[in-house]
From Swiss-Prot:
Similarity comment: family membership: Belongs to the complex I NdhO subunit family.
A cellular component annotation (GO) from this entry: plasma membrane-derived thylakoid membrane
Name of this protein: NAD(P)H-quinone oxidoreductase subunit O
Gene: ndhO
Top-rank lineage group of the source organism: Bacteria
Keyword Kinase annotated: no
Principal location listed in the UniProt entry: membrane
Thylakoid listed as a keyword: yes
Membrane topology: Peripheral membrane protein
Natural source organism: Prochlorococcus marinus (strain MIT 9211)
Disulfide bonds: none
């Protein structure tokens, strides 16, 4: 068999309505983390948040809490699995 016969399934692209959580490693080393509070809230890493809108490389996320919606880079998000 050749290497091309083994394909790793690609994750589904994140889109409007997707449930997500923040990838801690990607977020903590980002410009967005530097511009925010030094200690991010734990709920963003636990999820789920819902993507409301996608524009370019960013997604607007709404959390199931009484907090404002936030814009985060899509590469900082990962799909939420129960």
């Amino acid at each position: 068999m050749t290497d091309s016969s083994f394909s790793v399934p690609k994750p589904k692209p994140l889109k409007k309505g997707s449930l997500v959580l923040v990838n801690r490693e990607a977020y903590e080393s980002s410009l967005e983390a530097l511009a925010s509070d030094a200690l991010p809230p734990q709920y963003i890493f636990e999820g789920p948040g819902e993507i409301l809108m996608v524009k370019g490389d960013y997604a607007q996320v709404r959390w199931r809490r009484p907090v404002p919606d936030v814009w985060l880079r899509i590469d900082q998000l990962k799909a939420w699995a129960e």
